[in-house]
């Protein structure tokens, strides 16, 4: 009954394991399965036959390493070679050659792909599993209508429904339905076979009338009737082979191919024994489905829950890559067939290598990784983000749902998600509940089901046995909830425990329990598992926290958290950002870019990542942790990566915080910080921006990279070398030239500027015919040039241009407007940076680093931050780090509070500071105003919290428009910083301005600064010359647009302008 047994306690599986297993499944048998489907190809005269011998295909080792593929913007892939034969039938001669099919992208050691130098990941998709599902719904008369929905492997749906008169219909389209007798006859069964293979033949005979008897009298009549209803054609169609082919292609192939998983599900649900290799819908399936539908009508059998995970399947990277490989082979088949026919027509002798080209496979995979919604650019903001992105599961994508049509029931948490899909970690917004994250112990089975581990409780064996169960199995067992299990087994056996059974929650005796959870974190994803005291937080805030941890910026000097959950080490290890020794040895050389080990008579060089840019512009860098002469063991950390310290994840800093209002500067989630965080580089981070330019071959000639740029100030060109490219280590400011480039153009005499013609006439100087198209540093890009790459592709044509990339590093301190957050959904914007002498200070004189608003806690119900804050203070004084598993109340009542207070009490005793733990108000302390030295009226909660700096920084957001583009239709300024857009003045902003009575500002915003074309053109001249800006004489463009749209609906809107002088009405045409 319970399979896949492993004895003993399990470790947490590697977080990229699901990706690795999926890719290995594709390489091991997905490739071979698709290659075996490749047909033998003959020419039109059937004299030449081409075939692939797929038993001995080969995948070559990659020609480049992963690091080089990223640096040179190449794809990390392997070449696929397959033996192919060309047989001449008249003489039975055969020519065999090994042909190159194409490149298959390989998964890297981190479970990701490198395509054109960009890290990409393929996320898992959750689809409705193919098979049959029964459900009921009320019609307009209040009567239950029972339907059975058959879902194909391609996602196509067919329905069987039974009406009030117990007649069974097959619905072929939304509006058309046909008798099940006709559809079964069209599939190849006669009336006698139908009646012999059903459980209730009398019901089938009851709705058989004379008209239906004629239709099912012959298969041709049944097919004609089926086609007429399916295609909605009138008249009397004539039976033909082309009609059969059209029906086969449009209906049966799309809606009747079940696949391996669908055949397995269909056999289980309908108690059939059809072989697994028979993957198409058979008449026997349809009749068995009709029998079950009749049983449902009369109260026999159970309806299906479509949202249960046993009725879902995971479409992993293996399935997606296999589908694309099959598509590429179909394209290759067409290419080979066309090439054979062309060679015969021109009387050429083909060879297997001449017939096969690598283009179909290469282009198919390039378009898949570039365009498919489930192939995404890897989010590399910090190490945690990389892990979580690979463990996402999505209901969206081809064959899935859309954000606008998905119902609340699909988005909601289901009991079958327990231990499989995290109930907390999902995206916010329109995709809430549709994009989730797999729980940390979840794994994907070979049939696409998500499995989770349990301990099986057996009377015969005293040892606990670990079993991985799919959702369809554990539903029928009593599963004890893991958050209520006591440590003492003897006490545990005497008590009643809460348990799950068939989607119900019960309280039963311990002897009746079949299974129990193995781990407190079992239900959560990686992001949620890093939140300490998560059980004390509202789920909405825990969701925000798990999302915001992925947005944390790696800091220049990271720090381990005082209060954690214990998974920080594994998160850092599985992210691959740290350099880890793969063997024992001795360090003989260390530098910033490499470490050299010696052992067993040879040396090994370990290259380190130096100032690598992530796709979110954060800095990925490795710092050496070992010194020369030190002996190293296998698995020891040699260098810390970004946001890791000592092999643990370190996303933020432990800072001293106080929860109190301060002059309104922390109103509505604003945060007050000390200047110490700025001057001591506590929250300083490095960001690397990439700027690139390409050189093309134009119709007038090639573009040139040069330092000699006419008509530009020498100051702007000061950082260029003799080739016209910015020098490494240069400090560049906004507007500086990074790459000098000239584009040739044809210049007519009339197009020259007057000064150009003067120079030519007097001095005889030949005016340049090239246009300056240099790469300039945009606004906000100032920094240090750390790398320049000149990528020259083979055969530099206009289709294959050269690319020059310049990487500039920026050092960013904390500023007003930056976003910070804790690990409990407590986020805020920095409102003011106070001098440290003005900050509130503790009784030992220590100034506070951050001041949070206490009103942010009660309404949000994220009390976990209070526990973390106080325990962090105790840990700071005692020099301890705490790793607290969630749901510690399963050991005793109020366990979290007791732990915090006992540690605070010990810290108070050891440091001889009674104010650390005061029994009257435990956790709080009297603190003083830094400006006056007076104590505040009330005791204030103080402590050490782990605060993150998020990627939402004011330098990337702040923007002002001086002039820019306008929308073509409305003639209003565009929106967004990237388009140099304007600020939107919405309805509520207009109300505020109206409330102040600022008529002129309102008029400017509605006319000159927005969409009054003539008036805004006059503003410039009036501003230069001086004088009064004239009032706009007619309606703005948006009003004219409204009038035109009403006219298109045959509604005439007249508008009039009232003269200020004589109050006469003047009609104006819109």
Swiss-Prot record:
What is this enzyme's EC?
Answer: 2.7.7.6
Provide the protein's localization.
Plastid, Chloroplast
Where does the secretion signal sit in this chain? none
Swiss-Prot/TrEMBL GO biological process terms: DNA-templated transcription
Q: Which domain of life is it from?
A: Eukaryota
Q: Give the top-level enzyme category.
A: transferase
Instruction: Give the molecular function GO annotations.
Output: DNA binding; DNA-directed RNA polymerase activity; ribonucleoside binding
Coarsely, its chief localization is: plastid
Write down a Pfam family by its short name: RNA_pol_Rpb2_2
Q: Which UniProt keywords apply?
A: Chloroplast, DNA-directed RNA polymerase, Nucleotidyltransferase, Plastid, Transcription, Transferase
Q: Show the catalytic activity.
A: RNA(n) + a ribonucleoside 5'-triphosphate = RNA(n+1) + diphosphate
Q: Any one cellular component term from GO for this entry?
A: DNA-directed RNA polymerase complex
Q: What does this protein do?
A: DNA-dependent RNA polymerase catalyzes the transcription of DNA into RNA using the four ribonucleoside triphosphates as substrates.
The text of the family note is: Belongs to the RNA polymerase beta chain family.
Provide the assembly information. Answer: In plastids the minimal PEP RNA polymerase catalytic core is composed of four subunits: alpha, beta, beta', and beta''. When a (nuclear-encoded) sigma factor is associated with the core the holoenzyme is formed, which can initiate transcription.
Q: Which HAMAP family match?
A: RNApol_bact_RpoB (MF_01321)
Name it: DNA-directed RNA polymerase subunit beta
Q: Which organism is it from?
A: Piper cenocladum
């Amino acid at each position: 009954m319970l399979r896949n047994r492993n004895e003993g306690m399990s470790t947490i599986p590697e977080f990229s394991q699901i990706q690795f297993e999926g890719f290995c499944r594709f390489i091991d048998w997905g490739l071979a399965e698709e290659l075996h489907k490749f047909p033998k190809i003959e020419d039109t005269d059937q004299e030449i036959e081409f075939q692939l011998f797929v038993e001995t295909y080969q995948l070559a080792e990659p020609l480049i390493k992963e690091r080089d593929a990223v640096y040179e913007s190449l794809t990390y892939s392997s070449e696929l070679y397959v033996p192919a034969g060309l047989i001449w039938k008249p003489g039975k001669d055969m020519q065999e050659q090994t042909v190159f099919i194409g490149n298959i992208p390989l998964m890297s050691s981190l479970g990701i792909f490198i395509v054109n130098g960009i890290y990409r990941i393929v996320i898992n998709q959750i689809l409705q599993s193919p098979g049959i599902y029964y459900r009921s719904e009320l019609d307009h008369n209040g009567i239950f209508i029972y339907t059975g929905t058959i879902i194909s492997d391609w996602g196509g749906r067919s329905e069987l429904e039974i009406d009030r008169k117990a007649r069974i219909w097959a619905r072929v389209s939304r509006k058309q339905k046909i008798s099940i007798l006709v559809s079964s006859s069209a599939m190849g069964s006669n009336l006698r076979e139908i009646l012999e293979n059903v459980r209730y033949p009398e019901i089938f005979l009851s709705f058989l009338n004379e008209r239906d008897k004629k239709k099912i009298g012959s298969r041709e009549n049944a097919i004609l009737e089926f086609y007429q209803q399916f295609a909605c054609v009138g008249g009397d169609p004539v039976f033909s082979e082309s009609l059969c082919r059209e029906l086969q292609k449009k209906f049966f192939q799309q809606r009747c191919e079940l696949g391996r998983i669908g055949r397995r599900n269909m056999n289980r649900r309908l108690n059939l024994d059809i072989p697994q290799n028979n993957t198409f819908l058979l008449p026997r399936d349809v009749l068995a489905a009709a029998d079950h539908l009749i049983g449902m009508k009369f109260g026999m059998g159970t309806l299906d829950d479509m949202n249960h995970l046993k009725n879902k399947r995971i479409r992993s990277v293996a399935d997606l890559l296999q589908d694309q490989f099959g598509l590429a082979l179909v394209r290759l088949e067409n290419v080979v067939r066309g090439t054979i026919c062309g060679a015969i027509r021109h009387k050429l002798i083909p060879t297997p290598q001449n017939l096969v080209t690598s283009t179909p496979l290469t282009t198919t995979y390039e378009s898949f990784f570039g365009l498919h919604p489930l192939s995404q650019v890897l989010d590399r903001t910090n190490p945690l983000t990389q892990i979580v992105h690979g463990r996402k599961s999505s209901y969206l994508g081809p064959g899935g749902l859309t954000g606008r049509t998905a119902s609340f029931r699909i988005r909601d948490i289901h009991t079958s998600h327990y231990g499989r899909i995290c109930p907390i970690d999902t995206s916010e917004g329109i995709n809430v509940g549709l994009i989730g994250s797999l729980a940390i112990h979840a794994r994907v089975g070979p049939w696409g089901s998500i499995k989770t581990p349990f301990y099986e409780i057996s009377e015969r064996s005293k040892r606990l046995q670990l079993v991985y169960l799919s959702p369809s199995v554990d539903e029928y067992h009593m599963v004890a909830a893991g958050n209520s299990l006591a440590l003492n087994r003897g006490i545990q056996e005497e008590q009643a425990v809460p348990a799950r059974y068939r989607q119900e929650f019960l309280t039963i005796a311990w002897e009746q329990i079949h299974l129990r959870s193995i781990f407190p974190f079992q239900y959560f994803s990686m992001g949620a598992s890093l939140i300490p005291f998560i059980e004390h937080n509202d789920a909405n805030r825990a969701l925000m926290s798990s999302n915001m941890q992925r947005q944390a910026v790696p800091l220049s000097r990271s720090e381990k958290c005082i209060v954690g959950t214990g998974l920080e080490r594994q998160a850092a290890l599985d992210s691959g950002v740290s350099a880890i020794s793969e063997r024992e040895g001795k360090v003989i050389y260390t530098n910033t870019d490499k470490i050299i080990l010696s052992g067993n008579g040879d040396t090994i060089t370990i290259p380190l990542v130096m100032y690598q840019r992530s796709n979110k512009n954060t800095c990925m860098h490795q710092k050496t942790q070992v010194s020369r002469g030190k002996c190293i063991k296998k698995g020891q950390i040699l260098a810390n990566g970004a946001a890791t310290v000592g092999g643990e994840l370190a996303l933020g800093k432990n800072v001293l915080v106080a929860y109190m209002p301060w002059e309104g500067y922390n109103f509505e989630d604003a945060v007050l910080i000390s200047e110490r965080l700025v001057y001591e580089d506590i929250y300083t981070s490095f960001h690397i921006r990439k700027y690139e330019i390409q050189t093309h071959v134009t119709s007038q000639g090639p573009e040139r990279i040069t330092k000699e740029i006419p008509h530009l100030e020498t100051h702007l060109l000061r950082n260029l070398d003799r080739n016209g490219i910015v020098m490494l280590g240069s400090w560049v400011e906004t507007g500086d030239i990074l790459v000098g480039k000239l584009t040739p153009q044809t210049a007519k005499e009339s197009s020259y500027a007057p000064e150009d013609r003067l120079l030519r006439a007097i001095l005889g100087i030949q005016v340049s015919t090239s246009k300056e198209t240099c790469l300039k540093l945009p606004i906000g890009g100032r920094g240090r040039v750390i790398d320049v790459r000149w990528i020259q592709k083979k055969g530099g044509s206009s289709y294959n241009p050269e690319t020059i990339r310049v990487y500039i590093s920026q050092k960013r301190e904390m500023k007003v407007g930056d976003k910070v957050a804790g690990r409990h959904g407590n986020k805020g914007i920095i409102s003011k940076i106070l001098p440290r002498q003005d900050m509130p200070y503790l009784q030992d004189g220590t100034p506070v680093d951050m001041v949070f608003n206490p009103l942010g806690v009660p309404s949000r119900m994220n009390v976990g931050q209070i526990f973390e804050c106080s325990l962090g203070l105790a840990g700071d004084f005692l020099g301890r780090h705490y790793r607290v598993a969630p749901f510690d109340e399963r050991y005793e009542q109020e366990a979290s509070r007791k732990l915090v207070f006992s540690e605070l009490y010990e810290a108070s005793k050891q440091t001889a500071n009674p104010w650390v733990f005061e029994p009257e108000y435990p956790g709080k302390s009297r603190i003083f105003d830094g400006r006056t030295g007076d104590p505040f009226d009330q005791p204030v909660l103080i402590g050490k919290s782990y605060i993150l700096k998020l990627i939402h920084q004011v330098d990337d957001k702040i923007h002002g428009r001086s002039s820019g583009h306008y929308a073509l239709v409305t003639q209003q300024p565009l929106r967004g910083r990237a388009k140099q857009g304007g600020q939107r003045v919405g309805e509520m902003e207009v109300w505020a301005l109206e409330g102040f009575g600022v008529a002129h500002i309102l008029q400017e915003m509605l006319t000159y600064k927005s969409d009054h074309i003539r008036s805004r053109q006059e503003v410039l001249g009036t501003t230069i010359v001086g004088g009064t800006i004239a009032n706009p004489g007619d309606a703005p463009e948006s009003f004219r647009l409204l009038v035109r749209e009403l006219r298109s609906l045959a509604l005439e809107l007249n508008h009039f302008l009232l003269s200020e002088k004589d109050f006469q009405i003047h009609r104006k045409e819109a």
